[in-house]
Amino acid sequence: PLPASPVPAPGRGIDIAALVAAGLAEVERNERATAAARQQARPTLLERITRRHLRPAHLASVHIRRAAAVLATAGWCRGELTDASGRHCILGALQAVAAEADTALRSHVHIRAAMTDPAPYARPSGAYLARLDAEARAQGLDPADVRRRHDIAVANNIGQLTVGAVLELLERAAAIAESAGD
C-alpha cells in the first residue's frame, strides 16, 4: 500500500521541519499526479478533428484515464458521486465519462485490481455485507456487482487520503488495463 506521504513521520516528538517537508511533498505529489492525469487524457489533434474523444470509450484504459482527467480538472470529493461544486468521487467520475456498458464493468475490475486491501477499520462487518446483499436482491440487482462498487466507494471515502493518491490509483488501474490489452 502507498503511504499518504513519501516522507516518513519522526520517531518521537513533533518535528516541525519534517511536518512542513511532508506537507510540501504531498502538495508536489498531488500536482504531479494532476498534471499527469490531464496530460494522459488530453486528446490529440486528430481526435479533436474527428471528435473521437467525445465518443464512448471502448477500452477500459481510455475510460479510466478520462475519468482521472475529470477528477484532475473538476476536483475530487468523498461521500457522494458529484457534489454541489461539481467535484466527483471515483465512481462519479467513471459515470461522468461516456463508455460502453461492458467497458465500464471492465474499468471497475481493473480499478479493483489496482487497489490494495483496505485497512481493518475500513472493512465493513459481516452483518453489514449481509444487509447490503439482501437490499441488492430486493432491488433486483446482482449482489456481487453491488459489492464491487462498494469496494471502490470504500477506497474513495476511507482508503485514499488525497487527490494525488486517487489519481495514482487510477493510473495504476489504467496501466493494468493496458497490459491486459484493454
Spans of features found by a protein language model:
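Extended, charge-enriched "interface" segments that sit outside catalytic cores
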Residues: 93
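Domain-length accessory/inserted modules outside core catalytic folds
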Residues: 1-87, 96-182
